[in-house]
A protein has these predicted regions:
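Leucine-rich tandem repeat or coiled-coil scaffolds
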Residues: 1-269
Length: 269
C-alpha cells in the first residue's frame, strides 16, 4: 500500500492531473494514511476528489488533515462518516473556498452536523450543490438547513438567505435549483408574497411589521415596482409555470389599495 501511495504521489505532481478517485480501498495503517493525506495536500493541480466506501476513520483523517481549500468537488459518499461534534465540514464550507460540489450522502451525519452546516451556509459561499441524503438528519437539522436557504420569517431574512446552494437528497427540496443566484432570490421572494396573498392574510400586515421607520412610506413605490419586475424576471427565466396560481394584478392591487398609499400622497402634498 505504501509503495502504491508513493507512486500515486509522483503522478499527482503532474499539473495535468485534475481529479482522483479512490473507491473501496480502505487504508488500514495509520502511517500509510498520514502518507496519503500528505499526498493529497501536495497534489499540484488536484481540484476533484472522490473518496467513497473507505470508512469513517479514513474520511475523518482527510477532513482533519488535508488542505481542502483548493478543491472544487469533493465526494465523501457512503463512508459511515460521523463527526462527533467536530466542525471540519462546516468550517470547510465557511472558508469561502472554490468548493462548488460537496457530496456527503449515505453517511452518519446528524442534526448537530446539519445545524453547523446550515450556519456555514449563512456566510457567502461558492458552493452550488450539497448532497446530504441518507444520513441521520431529522426534523431539527432539516429545518435548520431549509432556513439557511429559504428563511421565510420575513422578506429581509429571505433576501439574506443562501441563494446559490442546492440541497440535494432532502425530500421535496427544489430550492435553489436554478444556476442563477439572483433568479433564485427573485423567485423565492415572489413566491413568499404570492403565498401570503393566496392565504387570505395578504402582504400588507407583514410589510407594516417588516418595513418600519418614518421614511418607510418612501419605499412604497419601489416595493410595488419590484413586484412587477420580479414577475417579469421569473417569466424570462423560464419559471412561468410556478406563477400559474398567482395573479400579478391581485398582488399589485392589494398593495396599491391598502398599503401606504394615503400616507404617500399626504407626504407628497
Amino acid at each position: 500500500m505504501r509503495r502504491a501511495i508513493r507512486e500515486l504521489g509522483r503522478v499527482l505532481k503532474n499539473v495535468r492531473v485534475k481529479s482522483l478517485k479512490w473507491t473501496e480501498i480502505p487504508i488500514e495503517s495509520a502511517d500509510d494514511m498520514v502518507l496519503f493525506t500528505q499526498m493529497l495536500s501536495d497534489g499540484v493541480a488536484l481540484d476533484e476528489l472522490r473518496f467513497d466506501q473507505n470508512g469513517h476513520e479514513n474520511t475523518q483523517a482527510i477532513l482533519s488533515s488535508v488542505d481542502l481549500s483548493k478543491y472544487k468537488k469533493l465526494d465523501f459518499e457512503d463512508n459511515h462518516l460521523r463527526t462527533n461534534g467536530r466542525a471540519d465540514i462546516s468550517n470547510l464550507i465557511a472558508l469561502n473556498s472554490p468548493l462548488e460540489t460537496l457530496l456527503l450522502s449515505s453517511n452518519s451525519l446528524n442534526d448537530v452536523d446539519a445545524v453547523l452546516i446550515a450556519e456555514s451556509l449563512g456566510h457567502y459561499s461558492h458552493l452550488r450543490k450539497l448532497d446530504l441524503g441518507y444520513n441521520n438528519i431529522l426534523e431539527r437539522g432539516l429545518n435548520a438547513l431549509i432556513r439557511a436557504v429559504n428563511d421565510t420569517s420575513s422578506l429581509n431574512a429571505l433576501s439574506d438567505s443562501n441563494h446559490s446552494c442546492h440541497l440535494g437528497g432532502l425530500h421535496g427540496s427544489v430550492i435553489n435549483e436554478n444556476q442563477c443566484e439572483n433568479l433564485n432570490r427573485i423567485f423565492k421572494i415572489h413566491l413568499l408574497m404570492a403565498e401570503r396573498y393566496r392565504s387570505g392574510e395578504g402582504n400588507v400586515q407583514y410589510l407594516n411589521r417588516e418595513i418600519v421607520g418614518s421614511n418607510s412610506v418612501l419605499l412604497a413605490p419601489f416595493i410595488i415596482e419590484s413586484v412587477h419586475r420580479r414577475h417579469a424576471a421569473i417569466e424570462e427565466g423560464g419559471l412561468a409555470y410556478s406563477l400559474r396560481d398567482t395573479s400579478l394584478l391581485g398582488l399589485l392591487y392589494e398593495l396599491v389599495k391598502d398599503w401606504e398609499m394615503p400616507d404617500l400622497f399626504s407626504f407628497n402634498n
